[in-house]
Structures are given as C-alpha cells and as structure tokens.
Amino acid sequence: MAKELIGNDWDKVLDPVFASDKYHELHNFLKEEYSNKRIFPDMYHIFTAFKLTPFNKTKVVILGQDPYHNPGQANGMSFSVMPGTPLPPSLRNIYKELYDDVGVRPVNHGYLKKWADQGVLLLNAVLTVPYAHANGHQGKGWEDVTDTAIKALSERGKVVFILWGRFAQNKIPLIDQSKNFIIKSSHPSPFSADRGFFGSRPFSRCNTALLNFGETPIDWQLSETVNKSDLA
C-alpha cells in the first residue's frame, strides 16, 4: 500500500489512486505550489474531510467544488469555514434553508465538524486552491481521488448524496441510484438559491432517506460556540 495519507480506511479505498503516476504528478505539483504561492487549506488540512469521516462511517456526502480561496476560510471540509470567519453567502443560505426545513437555529460560526463527526462527508471535488483563484487547481489530478471516493461509496451503498448545482450534479453518472439516494437542487449561492435551493428541504429528505436505509438520522443542530479542543 502507498504511504498512509489519511490514517483510516480511506487509505485502502484510495490506495490505487495514491499509488498512481497521476497522483505522483499531483504531489510534485503541490509541493511546488505550496513552496511558491499561498494555497488553501494549509497542507495539514487537505484531507480533513476524509480524516473526520471514515469510509465505513460515511452516510451522507455534501459535494462542493473547491475550497474557499481567501485567508482564514478553508479548513478541508466543503462549505465549512474556520470559527471567527464571517459566514460566506452560500453558507448563510444553507443555514436559512436548514431553519426553514428542520427548524435548526442558525449559529454565528460556519464550522461544520459536528456534521462530519456524524458521518457527513463534506467533500470538495478539488481539495486545494490558490489564493484568490477559484478553480485554480481544477484538472490537476484531485478529481481522480474524489471520483474514486464517490464511486467506492456508491458501490458500498446506502449513502445519501446531496448535490447542489450543475458541477456537483455532473457526478451523478458515478452514483448507482438503485443503492443510494440523490438529493439535487440549484446551488445555495446568492446567484442561484432562489432558483430551486430554497424550499428544496434537503436536510429532512436526507434524514428520511437515512431512516429508510436503517441508519440513524443526522442531528443538524450545530453548537453555539466552538472550543479549541473541537478543532480538527
């Protein structure tokens, strides 16, 4: 097996990718990028989503595109930001729908680790991004890693995939819909939230699907505050 990069069962699932020439190229590219540019998240948090939510514990996938590209935001989990960082507009809209859907009180931080700890894989399709350059690492090799993860989860089955926006929905061909459940709508971005995201009730629908799979539903309520000991 290639060197353990994650430290749980994802290493075995992703080993064929980590051992590939394509990943070796990505690794060398990232070494150069991190040496010469500001890249987010920091290299210690690239695999946070996988570390917090092991393969066999994953019940839900919320798929993002790539990390936030401004300082202090990206933490290795899709849509999540570090405590103390202003909420990005998409996350504000997620909280609004969360309240309208299941009555969850909005909190003043955007740190979503509590969801990850319950089996929600907060996965970006591309795991790194240069400062102020959205999609700057697209097509460099991360898609091999994350597509492999999606396909492996699909094959295992009983996973709810929450796909917001066209980019995420382009991954539908990777998912066996006879064994899994897909929830899709427009993206929560202010540019598209009014075109189908608001009112789509993804959180209650997710929990209904989990119950149908015989799984425990997600407690979507986040803690009011985040302690240092809670940080990944």
Curated annotation (Swiss-Prot):
Catalysed reactions, semicolon-separated: Hydrolyzes single-stranded DNA or mismatched double-stranded DNA and polynucleotides, releasing free uracil
Alphabetical list of Pfam families matching this protein: UDG (PF03167)
GO molecular function: uracil DNA N-glycosylase activity
One of the GO BP terms on file: base-excision repair, AP site formation via deaminated base removal
PROSITE patterns documented for this protein: U_DNA_GLYCOSYLASE
Gene3D superfamilies: Uracil-DNA glycosylase-like domain
UniProt EC number: 3.2.2.27
Location in the cell: Cytoplasm
GO cellular component: cytoplasm
Keywords, sorted A to Z: Cytoplasm, DNA damage, DNA repair, Hydrolase
Enzymatic class: hydrolase
Presence of the UniProt keyword Cytoplasm in the record: yes
Active site per database record: D66
Xref: PANTHER family: URACIL-DNA GLYCOSYLASE
Purpose: Excises uracil residues from the DNA which can arise as a result of misincorporation of dUMP residues by DNA polymerase or due to deamination of cytosine.
Family listed: Belongs to the uracil-DNA glycosylase (UDG) superfamily. UNG family.
Protein name listed in UniProt: Uracil-DNA glycosylase
Organism: Lactobacillus helveticus (strain DPC 4571)
Gene: ung
